[in-house]
């Protein structure tokens, strides 16, 4: 039976991706749209239909995935420079930190003075099934950190002490490459049932190791639900 509504997709128990982004049987949810269509849809989701609100606060645009730097870099320039995106001030790119910035996109980010870019770097640990050399790429993180005016931080999804030991090793490799930035640990768990099993231990590990703690706030506020 084909799942027709996004909200009817099962919620992944332990990972961060959606079923629509990684499983072929749900690929019909991944629709290709023109940049104009994407802009109109984004604006329809904003509280006031614009990126800078009347109270002076701005709405951040977050590019996530899957992996947002895998295939669409050249179109991001077109998206950011669209006339209806002229008041966009902040963009966060949630990346697994394995994909280098293409030359054109890198040049754009280095030259635009309008948009503040933050790289939210979440490298995969061995629990994800990725090999170390495929997942931990200090040269890529160094490139991100070198973007003019950019911010960067690491966010690792962990479940136990063994995961945190990997974080310590990875962070040292990034530091050896010249990348010094905040490090957050987030408890593994796509649903409240799994999340509550890990949250206290991860918080205590953060205090013991000197890392920052990142909760899954949407689970605490809304539980196991799509659209949060």
List each language-model region with its residue ranges.
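Auxiliary Fe-S-binding modules of radical SAM enzymes
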Residues: 160-228
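Secondary-structure boundary/capping motif
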Residues: 71-72, 129, 163, 194
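A structural motif corresponding to the C-terminal end of an alpha-helix
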Residues: 45-51, 55-58, 83-87, 142-152, ...
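Active-site beta-loop-alpha junctions enriched in small/polar residues
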Residues: 66-68, 96-98, 124-126, 157-159, ...
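Well-ordered, non-membrane alpha-helical segments in soluble/globular domains
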Residues: 35-42, 76-78, 134-141, 167-169, ...
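Radical SAM/AdoMet-radical enzyme domain recognition
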Residues: 61, 77-166, 179-181
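Conserved Radical SAM active-site core
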Residues: 1-115
């Amino acid at each position: 039976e084909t799942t027709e509504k996004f909200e009817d997709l099962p919620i992944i128990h332990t990972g961060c991706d959606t079923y629509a982004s990684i499983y072929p049987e749900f690929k019909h949810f991944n629709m290709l749209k023109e940049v104009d269509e994407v802009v109109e849809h984004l604006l329809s989701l904003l509280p006031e239909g614009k990126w800078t609100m009347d109270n002076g606060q701005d709405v951040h645009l977050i590019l996530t995935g899957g992996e947002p730097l895998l295939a669409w870099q050249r179109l991001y320039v077109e998206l950011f420079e669209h006339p209806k995106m002229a008041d966009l001030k902040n963009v966060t790119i949630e990346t697994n930190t394995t994909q280098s910035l293409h030359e054109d996109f890198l040049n754009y980010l280095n030259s635009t003075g309008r948009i503040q870019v933050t790289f939210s770097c979440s490298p995969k640990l061995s629990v994800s099934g990725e090999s170390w050399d495929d997942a931990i790429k200090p040269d890529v993180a160094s490139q991100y950190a070198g973007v003019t005016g950019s911010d960067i931080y690491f966010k690792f999804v962990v479940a136990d002490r063994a995961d945190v030991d990997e974080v310590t090793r990875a962070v040292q490799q990034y530091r050896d490459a010249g990348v010094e930035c905040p490090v957050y640990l987030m408890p593994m768990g796509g649903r409240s049932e799994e999340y509550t099993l890990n949250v206290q231990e991860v918080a205590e590990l953060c205090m013991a190791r000197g890392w920052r703690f990142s909760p899954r706030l949407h689970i605490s506020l809304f539980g196991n639900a799509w659209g949060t």
